[in-house]
């Protein structure tokens, strides 16, 4: 499986126009990838920032997705404050823990998303698999998680939660037992 994450900085006051574009033009343009594009989600952590993540079959699908994405971006270039940043790669880890969107439709989810600069991506993920993911998978609030290895020193991590409170409750429990996040600090070079 392959994943693509996109960060778009757009001009202040253009959020409604951007949403309208995605609904009326951007998403319909992706119909030709049906079956190979598994999932796509966008969210706005700030009024002028749009983050998106898409999951697809393989690199070939990602190349087709990039073509459509670039054509779409040309149509909204007057809304953009800068050229988008794109991170893509093979899905390094990933798991859907609950099919809660089918069983319990939700109007909203909480997405925790980070780009990490690490000293060694494989070492970081081995530690993640050893001490973090087993605790994560037991939590009631987690829906799905994964990471994308961009290169040997860059990872994109994401977690879908039932709510913002569920994520923060998990972090508090994790730090109450032991400060798990501290164990990752020697492997970090930075994050955004």
Predicted features, each with a name:
Residues 1-51, 55-192:
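Short S/T/G/P-rich N-terminal loop/turn motif that feeds into the first structured element of a domain
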């Amino acid at each position: 499986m392959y994943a693509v994450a996109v960060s778009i900085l757009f001009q202040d006051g253009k959020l409604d126009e951007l949403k309208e574009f995605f609904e009326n033009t951007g998403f319909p343009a992706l119909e030709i990838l049906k079956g190979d594009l598994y999932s796509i989600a966008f969210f706005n952590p700030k009024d002028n920032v749009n983050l998106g993540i898409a999951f697809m079959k393989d690199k070939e699908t990602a190349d087709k997705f990039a073509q459509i994405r670039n054509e779409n971006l040309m149509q909204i270039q007057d809304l953009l404050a800068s050229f988008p940043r794109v991170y893509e790669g093979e899905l390094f880890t990933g798991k859907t823990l609950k099919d809660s969107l089918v069983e319990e439709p939700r109007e909203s989810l909480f997405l925790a998303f980070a780009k990490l600069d690490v000293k060694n991506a494989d070492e970081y993920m081995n530690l993640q698999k050893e001490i973090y993911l087993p605790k994560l998978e037991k939590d009631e609030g987690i829906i799905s998680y994964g990471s994308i290895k961009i290169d040997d020193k860059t990872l994109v991590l994401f977690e879908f939660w039932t709510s913002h409170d569920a994520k923060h409750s998990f972090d508090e429990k994790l730090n109450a037992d032991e400060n798990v996040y501290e164990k990752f600090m020697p492997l970090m070079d930075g994050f955004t």
